[in-house]
């Protein structure tokens, strides 16, 4: 989960309010101290923390709850609203108004910028846009090959020339090339910057003046903490920052530094990086993000993941009919596990469900994820005949499958039991129910 430690601390603070027998000034001040402690531990700038919590305390002490709302509920609402305001109030997506829309990506060395360029290209491709990527990073020889490696499999073209040393010329040629190809979006990758490197910042300005981007996007490493504050200011002076993408938030204890950067620049966070895979990027929506952070769930986000999956998976009418007749195979189950994997880490999905929040321990979630991975490995060790006709799997085959997958016979039997339960469930459902379920889980 993004900002996991901060989320747990804030969720526990809200639980303290919810469980209190009554709400008085002392409890409100204790709440404020807990929030301050949680944000400072997440490396949010102290001055910004004090501004935020002063407003929470003022509102909690002065405002009267609307009719039908308890004092506790109103205080939780205040915390939610102020944190949302702190992060930008509302989602501000990148607007694709003109074709081509040109996006210039800038960032500190090691921020994950080049990987983020690939993620963004894939994100827009999945939504029906034709995307071209320009590599104008002449400082890092491997940048062009890295982009090719990430994007070739998705048939997203990358323009670059590892021998060319003029970044401005390369950027201009790349943009002109993709304009002639009629793409919808051109994403221009640049060399990693450092706030002290004036020559590189000057080059960035010159590229901007030549290609005239519709938006300049600053990529910030979520693990650097408060350093993000000063780096964002340095970029603010160098070029108008249209927006921010924060990377590496999935495992960072210092992600709060990114919040400081947003407040410093006044630029909205438009995307966040939530993992290492190319699909691990999501639009940043402050209300939904804060809702998840506080353990309140994100149903809209969950539904969007289902919808995205539906677009990628083709469901055939004959498959639905087959499942209804009880003809559900291990190969179908394998497809289901693959679809679940595409939705993202189990931990991330569970955080979107209201009521679960942080109530499930990480070790329990980890066991669930490991079990799914193990099932997939076991099925990889089966023959095509066994996947299509699981009834032929006797004890001799179970032993062979266990040896081939590096698991135990008990693990293989557990998978087969799970398969039989699913087969029984599908056979008992009507066509409409099964069709809906199949579309959601990629069968």
UniProtKB/Swiss-Prot annotation:
Please give the record's comment on domains.
Composed of three domains: the N-terminal N domain, which is responsible for interactions with the ribosome, the central G domain, which binds GTP, and the C-terminal M domain, which binds the RNA and the signal sequence of the RNC.
Q: Where does GTP bind?
A: 107-114, 189-193, 247-250
What does the record give under GO molecular function? Answer: 7S RNA binding; ATP hydrolysis activity; GTP binding; GTPase activity
Q: EC top class, in one word?
A: hydrolase
Native source organism of the sequence: Pyrococcus furiosus (strain ATCC 43587 / DSM 3638 / JCM 8422 / Vc1)
Note the superkingdom of the native organism: Archaea
Is GTP-binding a UniProt keyword of this protein?
A: yes
Name of the featured protein: Signal recognition particle 54 kDa protein
Oligomeric and partner information: Part of the signal recognition particle protein translocation system, which is composed of SRP and FtsY. Archaeal SRP consists of a 7S RNA molecule of 300 nucleotides and two protein subunits: SRP54 and SRP19.
The record's subcellular locations are:
Cytoplasm
SMART domains linked: AAA, SRP54, SRP54_N
UniProtKB keywords: Cytoplasm, GTP-binding, Hydrolase, Nucleotide-binding, Ribonucleoprotein, RNA-binding, Signal recognition particle
Family, as annotated: Belongs to the GTP-binding SRP family. SRP54 subfamily.
- The UniProt record lists the keyword Nucleotide-binding: yes
A matching Pfam family: SRP_SPB
Q: Cross-referenced InterPro entries, in alphabetical order?
A: AAA+_ATPase, P-loop_NTPase, Signal_recog_part_SRP54_M_sf, Signal_recog_particl_SRP54_hlx, Signal_recog_particle_SRP54_M, SRP/SRP_N, SRP54, SRP54_GTPase_dom
């Amino acid at each position: 989960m993004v900002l996991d430690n901060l989320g747990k601390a804030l969720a526990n603070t809200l639980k303290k309010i919810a469980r209190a027998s009554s709400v008085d000034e002392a409890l409100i001040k204790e709440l404020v101290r807990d929030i301050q402690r949680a944000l400072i531990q997440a490396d949010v700038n102290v001055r910004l923390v004090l501004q935020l919590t002063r407003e929470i305390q003022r509102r909690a002490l002065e405002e009267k709850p609307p009719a039908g709302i308890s004092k506790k509920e109103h205080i939780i609402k205040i915390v939610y609203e102020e944190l949302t305001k702190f992060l930008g109030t509302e989602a501000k997506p990148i607007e694709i108004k003109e074709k081509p829309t040109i996006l210039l990506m800038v960032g500190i060395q090691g921020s994950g910028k080049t990987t983020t360029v690939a993620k963004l290209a894939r994100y827009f491709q999945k939504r029906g846009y034709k995307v071209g990527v320009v590599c104008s990073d002449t400082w890092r020889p491997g940048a062009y090959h890295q982009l090719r490696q990430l994007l070739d499999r998705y048939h997203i073209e990358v323009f670059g020339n590892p021998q060319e040393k003029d970044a401005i010329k390369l950027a201009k040629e790349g943009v002109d090339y993709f304009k002639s190809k009629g793409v919808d979006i051109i994403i221009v990758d640049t060399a990693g910057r450092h706030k002290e490197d004036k020559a590189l910042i000057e080059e960035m300005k010159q590229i901007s003046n030549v290609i005239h981007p519709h938006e300049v996007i600053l990529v910030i490493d979520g693990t650097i903490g408060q350093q993000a504050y000063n780096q964002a200011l340095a970029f603010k002076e160098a070029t108008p920052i249209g927006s921010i993408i924060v990377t590496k938030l999935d495992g960072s204890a210092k992600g709060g530094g990114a919040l400081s950067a947003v407040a410093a620049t006044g630029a909205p966070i438009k995307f966040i990086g939530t993992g290492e895979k190319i699909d691990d990027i999501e639009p940043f929506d402050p209300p939904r993000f804060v809702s998840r952070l506080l353990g309140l769930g994100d149903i809209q986000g969950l539904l969007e993941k289902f919808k995205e999956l539906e677009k990628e998976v083709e469901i055939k009418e004959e498959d639905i009919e087959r499942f209804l007749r009880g003809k559900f195979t291990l190969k179908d189950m394998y497809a289901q596990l693959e679809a679940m994997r595409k939705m993202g880490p189990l931990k991330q999905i569970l955080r979107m469900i209201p009521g679960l929040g942080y109530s499930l321990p990480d070790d329990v979630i980890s066991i669930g994820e490991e079990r799914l991975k193990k099932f997939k490995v076991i099925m990889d060790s089966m023959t095509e005949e066994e996947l299509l006709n699981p009834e032929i799997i006797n004890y001799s085959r179970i032993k062979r499958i266990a040896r081939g997958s590096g698991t135990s016979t008990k693990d293989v039997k557990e998978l087969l039991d799970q398969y039989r339960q699913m087969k029984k469930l599908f056979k008992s459902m009507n066509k409409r129910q099964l069709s809906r379920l199949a579309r959601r889980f990629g069968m």
